[in-house]
Design a protein with these regions (language model features):
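Phosphate-binding/catalytic loop of phosphoryl-transfer enzymes
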Residues: 67-69, 75-179, 183-184
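ATP-binding/phosphotransfer module of carbohydrate and carboxylate kinases, centering on a glycine-rich
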Residues: 1-67, 76-82, 99-107, 123-131, ...
Length: 242
């Protein structure tokens, strides 16, 4: 048995996914819990600490955890210490989550935007070059966007670069979770697709939605909205890969 590991956590608006990798970067264990259930009492740090303690007790009694890496669908400070805003999860805004978890668990914790972690994996898995500009557009609960320049994520002065899901759409009036009106993820996101499914296709399983209804105008407009958002960034950055 390998005696060291790294724990990776993906905190989403729907689920929290936790995995452990061994010294060969191979996934050893994986669990998924409900974000809504975990954070229902509003005490984010303590609730997540409890989830992690249970995971550590179950899988890591005989190994040394070198680090916990957490991906969050949030805007983070440029030093990646503070969560600035999480539109789709209440109670996280302003938290120094990494510091609080380190104090509770005694294990080093790093925070990063979830989409940047996704792009790191895609870059590794698809053997993408570090040279030039690479972008990733990820449709989850919201719209995630990673911008990498010469192998490093673009954070911007305040850490909020690349918030593609919160670009205002012309004529948009829908209320976004961030507090603004007409953000792109109000029209092109996972939660918008769920909303459309419930309104127009209540009897169709989500997994079969595009198989059975791909020619419907409602879904075509949804796909066009995603394409519009992605194309805007492509035209601005002229990336080497997407």
């Amino acid at each position: 048995m390998n005696n060291e590991c790294v724990i990776g956590i993906d905190i989403g608006g729907t689920n929290i996914r936790i995995g452990r990798t061994d010294e060969n970067d191979q996934l050893v264990d994986f669990e998924r819990v409900s974000s809504k259930e975990t954070f229902k009492d509003g005490n984010i740090s303590e609730s997540l600490t409890e989830v992690l303690k249970n995971y550590l007790d179950k899988y890591c009694k005989n190994v040394q955890v070198k680090q916990i890496a957490i991906g969050i669908p949030a805007t983070l400070s440029s030093d990646r210490k503070q969560i600035l805003q999480v539109p789709n999860i209440k109670g996280m805004d302003g938290l120094f989550l990494g510091k609080e978890l380190e104090e509770n668990l005694g294990i080093p914790v790093v925070l990063e935007k979830d989409v940047n972690m996704l792009y790191y994996w895609d870059k590794y898995d698809k053997k993408l070059s570090d040279e030039g500009v690479g972008i990733g557009v990820y449709i989850g609960t919201g719209v995630g966007n990673a911008i990498f320049i010469n192998g490093k994520p673009l954070a911007g002065k305040d850490g909020v670069a690349g918030e593609l899901g919160h670009i205002p759409m012309i004529g948009g009036t829908s209320q976004c979770g961030c507090g603004n009106l007409g953000c792109s993820e109000c029209y092109a996101s996972g939660w918008k697709l769920v909303e459309l499914k419930e309104e127009y296709y209540p009897d169709v399983d989500m997994n079969d939605l595009f198989v059975k209804k791909s020619n419907d105008t409602v879904l075509k407009n949804f796909v066009d909205n995603i394409a519009c958002v992605a194309c805007a960034e492509i035209n601005i950055l002229n990336p080497d890969s997407i």
